[in-house]
Amino acid sequence: MQIITEPRQMQAIAEKLRLNRQFIGVVMTMGALHEGHLSLIKLARQSAGTVILTIFVNPSQFGANEDLHQYPRPFEQDVALATAAEVDYLFAPEAGTIYPENHQTTLQCGALGERLEGERRPGHFNGVATIVTKLLHITKPHIAIFGEKDAQQLAVIRRMVEDLNLDVKIIAAPIIREENGLAVSSRNIYLSNTERSTAGILYQGICHAEKSIAEQKKNLSVIAAEIEQMIASTPGWRPDYVVFVDEERFEPAEIAEEGKEYRLLLAAYAGKVRLIDNGKIVA
């Protein structure tokens, strides 16, 4: 595995790979690799001849009161995991090479990036869209693998790729869960043992939604309220939001229509730790 830190060098390598008809897959991360990331790399490895992994803790997607400086950066451990996962190129630039002093241009995501996570984290998705676009231009992949765990981020990226006519296929990888249903996440390290033991409540909420829909219950607002109550009644937990959205448009939905696909989005706090989860629901 070759480690690259300079954007121009990575671009030159990617251009040469394309000229040599190599099929490139990219996985973009902020490091602190876990089983979820490794599943994305595995999917890329199965789908592409050359796999590029990016590690970059993107400052433009962190808010003023968020944990940019506390975000874990176990680089040597990440290198070992990436090597074992048979990554071909690890692109790990410094912030100054991606956002030099005179950098001014950013992307605006519109309404999709302003609700739910975007409402609670103003500017977050603009930062995500900007860095993803930059990394796509630098690594020049044919496919890019993103996890379904960050469902709104995935929707924003798909919308951006379509709107900007970017020449890349976005592939979604399923959520990887722990035994109790907790979605694997870099933020799980902040959970106490007690919080981790009860963290399956979010997945239980998804299961409750699936069961309710299977029983022909159609009022999604009522189901969402029931899940909120489930979370609120779990010691140490408080819900932030529980919302159903139309899977195609990613707009809030209140009544389920037969045969239509929805996405249940959940965000909740365990103490000071904020976690998100989601599940696909078919009416």
Curated annotation (Swiss-Prot):
<feature type="binding site">
    <location>
        <begin position="184"/>
        <end position="187"/>
    </location>
    <ligand>
        <name>ATP</name>
    </ligand>
</feature>
<comment type="similarity">
    <text>Belongs to the pantothenate synthetase family.</text>
</comment>
<dbReference type="InterPro" id="IPR003721">
    <property type="entry name" value="Pantoate_ligase"/>
</dbReference>
<feature type="binding site">
    <location>
        <position position="153"/>
    </location>
    <ligand>
        <name>(R)-pantoate</name>
    </ligand>
</feature>
<feature type="binding site">
    <location>
        <begin position="147"/>
        <end position="150"/>
    </location>
    <ligand>
        <name>ATP</name>
    </ligand>
</feature>
<feature type="binding site">
    <location>
        <position position="61"/>
    </location>
    <ligand>
        <name>(R)-pantoate</name>
    </ligand>
</feature>
<dbReference type="GO" id="GO:0004592">
    <property type="term" value="F:pantoate-beta-alanine ligase activity"/>
</dbReference>
<dbReference type="InterPro" id="IPR014729">
    <property type="entry name" value="Rossmann-like_a/b/a_fold"/>
</dbReference>
<keyword id="KW-0963">Cytoplasm</keyword>
<comment type="pathway">
    <text>Cofactor biosynthesis; (R)-pantothenate biosynthesis; (R)-pantothenate from (R)-pantoate and beta-alanine: step 1/1.</text>
</comment>
<dbReference type="GO" id="GO:0005829">
    <property type="term" value="C:cytosol"/>
</dbReference>
<keyword id="KW-0566">Pantothenate biosynthesis</keyword>
<comment type="function">
    <text>Catalyzes the condensation of pantoate with beta-alanine in an ATP-dependent reaction via a pantoyl-adenylate intermediate.</text>
</comment>
<dbReference type="Pfam" id="PF02569">
    <property type="entry name" value="Pantoate_ligase"/>
</dbReference>
<keyword id="KW-0067">ATP-binding</keyword>
<dbReference type="GO" id="GO:0015940">
    <property type="term" value="P:pantothenate biosynthetic process"/>
</dbReference>
<keyword id="KW-0436">Ligase</keyword>
<feature type="binding site">
    <location>
        <position position="176"/>
    </location>
    <ligand>
        <name>ATP</name>
    </ligand>
</feature>
<dbReference type="GO" id="GO:0005524">
    <property type="term" value="F:ATP binding"/>
</dbReference>
<feature type="binding site">
    <location>
        <position position="61"/>
    </location>
    <ligand>
        <name>beta-alanine</name>
    </ligand>
</feature>
<comment type="subunit">
    <text>Homodimer.</text>
</comment>
<protein>
    <recommendedName>
        <fullName>Pantothenate synthetase</fullName>
        <ecNumber>6.3.2.1</ecNumber>
    </recommendedName>
</protein>
<feature type="active site" description="Proton donor">
    <location>
        <position position="37"/>
    </location>
</feature>
<dbReference type="InterPro" id="IPR042176">
    <property type="entry name" value="Pantoate_ligase_C"/>
</dbReference>
<keyword id="KW-0547">Nucleotide-binding</keyword>
<feature type="binding site">
    <location>
        <begin position="30"/>
        <end position="37"/>
    </location>
    <ligand>
        <name>ATP</name>
    </ligand>
</feature>
